[in-house]
Amino acid sequence: MNNNEYQIDRALEANDETLAAVRNLLAQLSTKEHPMDMELLSRILDSECTLLYLLRHIPTGEIVGMITLGTYSLLTGQKRWVEDVVIDNAHRGKGLGHTLLQHVRSEVAKLGGGSLLLTSRPSRVAANHLYQSEGYQRRETNVYKLEVPAE
């Protein structure tokens, strides 16, 4: 990472600091409520398929960004998805989104490479510009969603 004021580390265990930071960053990512508690965070971090990377501002020690890499195998091949890309409002405009995406690209290369996929709403103009500037190409596809209630 080129910027000496920031450091990226994989989150390996759930703790109060990580939980508070994830809650704060999720609130900045979406207006939709994302319930997050210690149990859920622990399950996510314990999963071999989910890698959460945290961006820390070294001078303050504050976690100011995150990115999630989801990876799993299917009959059609290895899938690697980028999710939950967010930089704290106070640290935006410094190229840190690029830094997180480049870090994940490097991690995927270490895992054997392959396609790196993500989705982004068209209304997120800055995010879409970021992804395109990193070499992501828009695919023509439909994404469908079905809400299934719990029993």
Regions flagged by a language model, labelled:
Residues 72-82, 92, 139:
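A conserved beta-turn-beta hairpin within the catalytic core of GNAT-like acetyltransferases
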Residues 82, 116-120:
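Conserved hydrophobic beta-strand within the GNAT/NAT acetyltransferase core sheet
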Residues 1-16, 151:
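Conserved N-terminal entry element of GNAT/NAT acetyltransferase domains
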Residues 56-58, 146-148:
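Active-site beta-strand termini and strand-to-loop segments that position acidic
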Residues 87, 93-106, 133:
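Conserved acetyl-CoA-binding loop-helix of GNAT-fold acetyltransferases
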Residues 31-54:
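Active-site rim helix/loop that mediates acceptor-substrate recognition in acyltransferases
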Residues 54, 62-71, 81, 86:
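Conserved beta-strand in the GNAT
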Residues 62, 98, 110, 122-140, ...:
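Conserved active-site alpha-helix within GNAT-family acetyltransferase domains
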